[in-house]
């Protein structure tokens, strides 16, 4: 479908725990915010059509819709599917077809809330790595203590174990992401570890530290502990996917716990309700910066195309954030800038 639009993104609307109602709701909100955005809804045509009807978009309306189209698929990648099985047997899945559309140049990015391992395997197979990159990684931004500043963290789940050289490459790519996308001059790169001392940690962590130290193009600042993830001591935090995923989900859980506990505390008595009403504007602003939904959307960095992974349990607000992240990366030409930077000084040895 040829359209006069500046941005085209393929959505795996069948992926995730919440189903098409959430992903399609987010899609409709996204196009209302950005008139030059075209979204291709990949998935079961009947289910998509029925879901769109809830938003007063009929099949007849869709035929002439300038911002939405359907790419029918016959399969769904389940959360329980093993990555290699999904890669071999789910070639007509909504996830695979969304990636194929990016590979074919019919879409500029793919967004999915589906099975992380399957998405990683399929994206790696379909889109291939940027030359010089051994392993792509999931990267996302997190809030820090300083207002309007955040920290990039990778890997968040794509690679359960990483050797020292892969961690080194993550540091290189994360540095490029922070510098090229956020405009940070000489981003501070740190390795997540069980302590700041040089003697702490496993051998592969120590070897990665040596490699990063030797690359003078990287502003490596040493080890950082989990308690300092939000301290603004680094612009990029590097770890393997197992540690990163556990750390991320723990942080999200704590943020929601604080939010719920605060609501309970401010409704415990009449006096508490009074103070709560007075402090409500300040707390609303605070929790807006802490809300995990706005940081939903981890990018598979290191690929030749843009792939954004939303959490499997994402609500409509969170999936919308993932779409917006994809839009931003398309506009800023992230893969091209990473490739250029790798070719001009940030060489992965």
Swiss-Prot record:
Cellular component per GO?
cytoplasm
Name of the encoding gene: plsX
Native organism: Colwellia psychrerythraea (strain 34H / ATCC BAA-681) (Vibrio psychroerythus)
The protein's matches in SUPFAM superfamilies, at most eight in alphabetical order, are given as: Isocitrate/Isopropylmalate dehydrogenase-like
Annotated GO molecular function terms are: phosphate:acyl-[acyl carrier protein] acyltransferase activity
Q: Which residues does UniProt assign to the signal peptide?
A: none
Short name of any one Pfam family annotated for the protein: FA_synthesis
Q: Is the keyword Lipid metabolism in the record?
A: yes
Location relative to the cell: Cytoplasm
- Pathways involved: Lipid metabolism; phospholipid metabolism
Q: What is the first-listed, main subcellular location in coarse terms?
A: cytoplasm
InterPro entries tied to this protein: FA_synthesis, Phospholipid_synth_PlsX-like
Which domain of life does the protein's organism represent?
A: Bacteria
Summarize the subunit comment: Homodimer. Probably interacts with PlsY.
EC number assigned by the record: 2.3.1.274
From the Swiss-Prot or TrEMBL record, give the protein name: Phosphate acyltransferase
